[in-house]
């Protein structure tokens, strides 16, 4: 039997189980600043973040051929570093508040990267562990992703692209930060091992680097038991971490105004953090369009399982995101047997490759979005067909053992290539 593979995962995640071990403050200053900026300012609420990292841990902690250490950023820690062990996995949580605050003070990306206070802490932890491989989940969030820079000289390092921040369309749909862009580009330049597993992101990535080794690395999805709600309160729900333009909240409101012409009592629930400027724009949009009786805003939930329970109150999922390949919310709604409407991204049509599982509207076309909403409202037979097809598809894709087997195989090949120059089998590599 091969010796255990020592893996370090660098990421940013949070869930209820982890927070039980963390000394967390109330972040009163943060809430005060939010009030000054007119963004609500309600008491800070810690929430489940980045469930794909929870998935990774769940898949790996049951393996007997891997020794996993997770180094994660976390807001609100009362200490700079917290270490504990659960179910054979070692966790190091590192305070990230100062790193994110410095982004508003040090505008030069190169200097910010050098002065990021998380970097020496993470570097020291990695040296202590001395892993076989370091894996970075996401290159677009610099407070933690920049901590891998330099480690590639000592260890084989691979990054998993959740998205490509240096996407020309990003500035059209939301906030663009030059530090985020700079750090991501540095990671592209320095790390020869990558996992960019969607065609859209792969083509963008290859515009920056053409000679790296690209591997498959599936996320998987974690679900929780829910109680079915027979009497629905809403027709449609859009849910995400925060109310944002990139997640299509405004387009959902505009499309609802069209649907209301023939369905005056139609109801839409918008779930997500309300501490954003865009939330205020959405409130005004609802008033201007006379939808006060049709739209309900629900704040974000602390636990992801509570989000999943809440969305049971809606009949359909309206998820017109614009930058994602396929948002995790799509798979989540499909799993809970909610017929889904999305925009046509480069990824969403692939869901319908074998059977029609979701309805797809033309990108940023609210008339097309409204047409799909009417299909679900007026054609229950069609809605039921989509529901069944979608559930079958998501169940077939969510095999944690298969996902982790592939990742471990690839990680071992990377270690052998880095240390011994052993060629990586072509069948391990992913191209489009």
Positions of PLM-derived features:
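Conserved donor-binding/catalytic core segment of Leloir-type glycosyltransferases
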Residues: 8-10, 195, 228-247, 253-256, ...
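Short hydrophobic beta-strand element within catalytic cores of glycosyltransferases
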Residues: 339-342, 359
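Nucleotide-activated donor-binding/catalytic signature segment of Leloir-type glycosyltransferases, i.e.
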Residues: 280-301
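A short, well-ordered alpha-helix in the C-terminal region of glycosyltransferases
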Residues: 368, 375, 382-397, 403
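Aromatic "clamp/platform" in nucleotide-sugar-dependent glycosyltransferases that forms part
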Residues: 322
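Conserved acidic donor-binding segment of nucleotide-sugar-dependent glycosyltransferases
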Residues: 354, 358-366, 375-380
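N-terminal subdomain of nucleotide-sugar transferases
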Residues: 1-79, 89, 430-432
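Membrane-proximal helix-turn-helix segments that form the acceptor-binding/catalytic region
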Residues: 55-56, 165, 175-193, 205-208
């Amino acid at each position: 039997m091969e010796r255990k593979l020592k893996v370090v995962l660098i990421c940013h995640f949070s869930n209820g189980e982890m927070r039980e071990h963390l000394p967390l403050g109330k972040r009163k200053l943060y809430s005060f600043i939010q009030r000054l900026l007119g963004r609500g300012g309600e008491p800070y609420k810690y929430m489940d973040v980045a469930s794909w990292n929870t998935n990774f841990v769940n898949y790996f902690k049951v393996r007997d051929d891997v020794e996993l250490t997770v180094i994660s950023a976390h807001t609100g820690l009362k200490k700079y570093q917290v270490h504990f062990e659960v179910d054979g996995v070692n966790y190091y949580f590192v305070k990230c508040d100062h790193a994110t605050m410095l982004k508003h003070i040090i505008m030069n990306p190169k200097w910010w990267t050098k002065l990021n206070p998380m970097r020496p802490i993470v570097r020291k932890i990695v040296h202590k562990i001395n892993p076989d491989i370091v894996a970075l989940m996401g290159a677009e969030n610099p407070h933690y992703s920049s901590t891998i820079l330099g480690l590639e000289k000592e260890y084989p390092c691979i990054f998993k692209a959740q998205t490509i921040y240096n996407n020309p369309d990003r500035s059209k749909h939301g906030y663009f930060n030059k530090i985020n862009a700079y750090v991501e580009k540095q990671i592209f330049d320095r790390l020869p091992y990558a996992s960019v597993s969607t065609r859209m992101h792969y083509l963008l990535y290859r515009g920056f680097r053409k000679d790296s080794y690209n591997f498959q690395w599936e996320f998987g999805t974690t679900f929780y038991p829910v109680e079915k709600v027979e009497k629905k309160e809403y027709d449609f729900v859009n849910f995400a971490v925060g109310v944002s333009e990139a997640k299509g909240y405004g387009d959902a409101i505009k499309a609802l105004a069209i649907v209301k012409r023939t369905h005056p009592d139609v109801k839409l629930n918008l779930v997500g953090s309300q501490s954003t400027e865009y939330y205020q724009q959405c409130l005004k949009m609802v008033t201007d369009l006379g939808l006060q009786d049709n739209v309900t805003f629900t704040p974000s939930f602390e636990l992801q399982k509570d989000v999943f329970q809440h969305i049971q109150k809606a009949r359909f999922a309206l998820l017109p995101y614009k930058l994602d390949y396929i948002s995790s919310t799509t798979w989540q709604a499909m799993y809970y047997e909610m017929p889904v409407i999305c925009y046509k991204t480069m990824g969403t049509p692939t869901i319908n490759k074998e059977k029609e599982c979701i309805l797809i509207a033309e990108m940023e076309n609210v008339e097309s979005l409204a047409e799909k909403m009417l299909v679900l409202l007026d054609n229950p037979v069609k809605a039921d067909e989509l529901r069944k097809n979608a559930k079958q598809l998501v169940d077939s894709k969510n095999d944690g053992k298969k996902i982790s087997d592939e990742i471990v195989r690839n990680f071992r090949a990377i270690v052998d290539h880095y240390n011994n120059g052993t060629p990586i089998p072509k069948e391990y590599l992913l191209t489009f």
